[in-house]
């Protein structure tokens, strides 16, 4: 048998073991102090430890801007910056704010700076939170606000004089001093206005009232006259059940249901557009052509007077993407341009990022992103007839993000990687004339230049803020793996530094014992394509040693996950625990292989119809190359872990390469595609291949997904595999892990299963039980050591 851990049955976790074989246990087991050292550098404990790592500017009409920061004690401050004078001034000290608001029963730490407005004699600072309070600056006089403060779940108008909320599945409009009125009618469960739909994978917390959210997929026109949004229809979808086995204050399990169309279901989410004239309440409902959907990550792209622009897509074959114009007064829809491809179509090299598209009001012009030449570049398009007036950027490199457009100066600002060669994931800053001409480098020096590019619609749809409204300045955060972030104000005409805004305080990170990783350039399995990896070395690594190696993988086609900046390396989106595992004696490697985003289209499309298979080929090739560069790596002891698509990939690694990968931890894995969500909005058929609507075969699995099901390879398992799932995970439903477990049972393969009660998809970041078991699993089965008998501290945001 495997040597089991001491039996423990905590309230929210039970380990079910199906075990055989025997692991060699080292005579020198790890100590509790080793785990404590690993804890200190865990991503969740270090989140926020890197103080003032970035600056989000809030621009005023006069060209100044303000931003928030933390002082040396972690208290919030606000700074006012005058770019013309190259000066910054703290608007308030925390102690002064405390004193000023105390007479009104408020305390500074419980207030949030909601807005700053210029007045004749200075500024008005509006605070929300414990109490609505207005403060005058520089006189620093505070008083309770006389104006109604928008609630936290409100969507404010551009002028700030009205806001939207969702009530009873409809949008309601309110202004200070006036009663709220319904702006839409006819909303109903599963087909509301501004309601967060279940396809966003947050249905359970929304139903529980734990997620007050602003109106979803809704936006104002710049002049505040119109409200436009996307209406989702989930009424025809089947109910999908989740069983909460240990609900609070009850011994009776509770069933939650959400609306979910899985791959191959005849009914999937449908969407339409609507526009409401706020002045007279006139509403236009726009039905999309059959088979077309609004591109879910794009939403509404922009406005030009009374004309709205959006991107919609059709995922038949070939796949088609359209830029469309909708007249707000009549609801008439017109196609501006159309692109097609047999694989993916998207408006950014990363589909999770905001579309690299800008509508230029009054110019009959759009800056449009396209991969039509095989890379990812910007084009100037005439809106009146869809004619491409010119390709603005070009070359064997890809635009990363469109940072803003200075219409008056006729410049488009963007970030890109690999323009001058080198690491294609390291961003530089550039601009290009709207009417054509050479690309001008503003900042590209080998360090990464992160400029706020806004967020995609699925993550709130916020517009970029880094470029000043007048186009004269950019806010740029400069960093590398070894260098903490430094945020500067940069002149947009030549890229010169105007002033330093913040130098991040990394003292808490360093004190915790965190060490920067290394960057390596490698070759893919084809022997030609450069790929890149980030490596976390054990503290005591030496070339004459023998250190096991762990492949820390995500691999989803939406992003890349090998860090290139200090902040990413300290506390990552996915995967986490890399620095922690290095402290436990493992070399930990993250690789951006073929099939992930950020590069050219062919590189990205390697995962189309193949999911993680090409990536795993590249990972094996890369690890073998690293074994030649780092003689201390023991390639007879290779492990892998991942979460979500990374969980799928980790399990698949042990099943496709059973003699190479010996130990794996797969949490919240999307182990088959037929059990995942389908459809055009963000379904597996859209992301990884096939023609919509996906039609099941006689076996119930739509082609071409049968070969991507991990269960089909269950008989190949030879190593140690720990499967992990949270019972309320809407992103990767628990059934997917249990279906793989059933296939492993049928094949009489041994594995381990960790069930986490009340947990959702965040378990890999916030669950100490998962983290503990994952570390133990690699220590016992890969390092051959006995884990210490210790308990990890709770992680921030973990389950109660």
Q: Positions of the model-derived regions?
A:
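N-terminal secretory signal peptides that target proteins for export/translocation
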Residues: 1-7
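Hydrophobic alpha-helical segments with strong N-terminal bias
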Residues: 4, 36, 500-501
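Beta-propeller folds
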Residues: 9, 13, 23, 27-460, ...
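Serine-hydrolase catalytic core recognition
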Residues: 63, 305, 311, 409, ...
């Amino acid at each position: 048998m495997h040597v089991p851990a001491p039996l423990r049955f905590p309230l929210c976790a039970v380990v079910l073991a199906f075990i055989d074989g025997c692991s060699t246990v080292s005579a020198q087991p790890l100590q509790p102090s080793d785990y404590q050292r690993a804890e200190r550098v865990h991503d969740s404990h270090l989140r926020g430890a890197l103080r003032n790592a970035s600056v989000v500017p809030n621009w005023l009409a006069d060209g100044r801007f303000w931003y928030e920061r933390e002082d040396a004690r972690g208290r919030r401050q606000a700074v006012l910056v005058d770019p013309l004078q190259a000066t910054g001034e703290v608007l308030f000290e925390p102690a002064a704010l405390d004193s000023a608001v105390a007479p009104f029963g408020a305390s500074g730490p419980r207030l949030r700076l909601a807005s700053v407005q210029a007045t004749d004699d200075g500024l008005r600072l509006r605070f929300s939170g414990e109490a609505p309070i207005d403060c005058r600056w520089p006189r620093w006089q505070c008083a309770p606000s006389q104006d109604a403060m928008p609630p936290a779940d409100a969507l404010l108008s551009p002028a700030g004089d009205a806001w939207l909320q969702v009530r009873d599945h409809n949008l309601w409009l309110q202004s200070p001093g006036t009663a709220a009125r319904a702006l839409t009618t006819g909303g109903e469960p599963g087909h509301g206005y501004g309601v967060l739909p279940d396809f966003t994978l947050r249905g359970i917390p929304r139903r529980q009232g734990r997620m007050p959210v602003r109106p979803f997929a809704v936006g104002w026109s710049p002049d505040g006259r119109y409200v436009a949004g996307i209406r989702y229809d989930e009424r025809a979808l089947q109910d999908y059940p989740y069983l909460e086995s240990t609900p609070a204050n009850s011994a009776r399990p509770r069933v939650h249901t959400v609306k979910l169309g899985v791959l191959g279901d005849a009914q999937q989410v449908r969407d339409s557009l609507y526009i409401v004239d706020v002045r007279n309440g006139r509403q236009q409902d726009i039905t999309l052509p059959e088979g077309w959907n609004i591109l879910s990550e794009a939403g509404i792209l922009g406005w030009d007077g009374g004309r709205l622009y959006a991107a919609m897509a059709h995922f038949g074959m070939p796949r088609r993407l359209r830029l469309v114009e909708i007249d707000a007064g009549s609801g008439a829809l017109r196609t501006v341009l159309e692109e097609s491809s047999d694989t993916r179509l998207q408006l950014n090299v990363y589909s999770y990022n905001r579309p690299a598209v800008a509508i230029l009001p009054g110019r009959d012009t759009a800056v449009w992103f396209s991969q039509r030449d095989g890379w990812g570049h910007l084009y100037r398009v005439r809106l009146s007839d869809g004619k491409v007036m010119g390709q603005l950027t070009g070359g064997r490199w890809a635009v990363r993000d469109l940072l803003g457009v200075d219409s008056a100066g006729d410049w488009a600002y963007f970030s890109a990687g690999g323009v001058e060669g080198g690491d294609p994931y390291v961003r530089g800053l550039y601009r290009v004339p709207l009417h054509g001409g050479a690309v001008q480098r503003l900042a590209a020096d080998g360090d990464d230049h992160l400029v706020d590019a806004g967020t995609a619609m699925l993550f709130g749809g916020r517009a970029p803020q880094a470029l000043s409204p007048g186009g004269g300045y950019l806010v740029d955060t400069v960093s590398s793996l070894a260098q903490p972030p430094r945020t500067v104000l940069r002149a947009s005409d030549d890229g010169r530094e105007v002033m330093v805004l913040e130098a991040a305080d990394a003292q808490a990170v360093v004190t915790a014992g965190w060490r920067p990783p290394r960057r390596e350039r490698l070759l893919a399995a084809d022997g030609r394509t450069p790929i890149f990896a980030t490596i976390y070395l054990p503290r005591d690594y030496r070339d004459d040693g023998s250190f096991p190696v762990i492949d820390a993988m995500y691999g989803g086609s939406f992003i890349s996950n090998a860090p290139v900046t200090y902040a990413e390396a300290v506390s990552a989106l996915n995967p986490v625990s890399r620095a922690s595992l290095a402290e436990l004696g493992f070399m930990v490697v993250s690789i951006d292989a073929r099939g992930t985003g950020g590069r050219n289209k062919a590189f990205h499309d390697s995962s189309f119809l193949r999911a993680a298979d090409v990536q795993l080929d590249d990972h094996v090739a890369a690890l073998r190359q690293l074994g030649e560069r780092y003689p201390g790596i023991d390639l007879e002891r290779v492990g892998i872990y991942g979460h979500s698509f990374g969980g799928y990939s980790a399990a698949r690694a042990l099943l496709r390469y059973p003699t190479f990968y010996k130990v794996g931890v797969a949490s919240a894995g999307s182990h088959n595609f037929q059990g995942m969500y389908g459809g055009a909005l963000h379904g597996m058929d859209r992301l990884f291949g096939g023609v919509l609507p996906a039609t099941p075969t006689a076996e119930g699995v739509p082609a071409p997904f049968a070969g991507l099901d991990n269960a089909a390879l269950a008989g190949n398992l030879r190593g140690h595999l720990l499967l992990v799932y949270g019972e309320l995970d809407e992103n990767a439903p628990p059934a997917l892990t249990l279906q793989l477990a059933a296939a492993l049972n049928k094949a009489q393969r041994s594995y381990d299963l960790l069930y986490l009660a009340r947990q959702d998809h965040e378990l890999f970041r916030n669950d100490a039980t998962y983290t503990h078991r994952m570390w133990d699993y690699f220590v016992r089965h890969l390092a051959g050591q006995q884990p210490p008998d210790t308990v990890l501290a709770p992680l921030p945001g973990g389950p109660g």
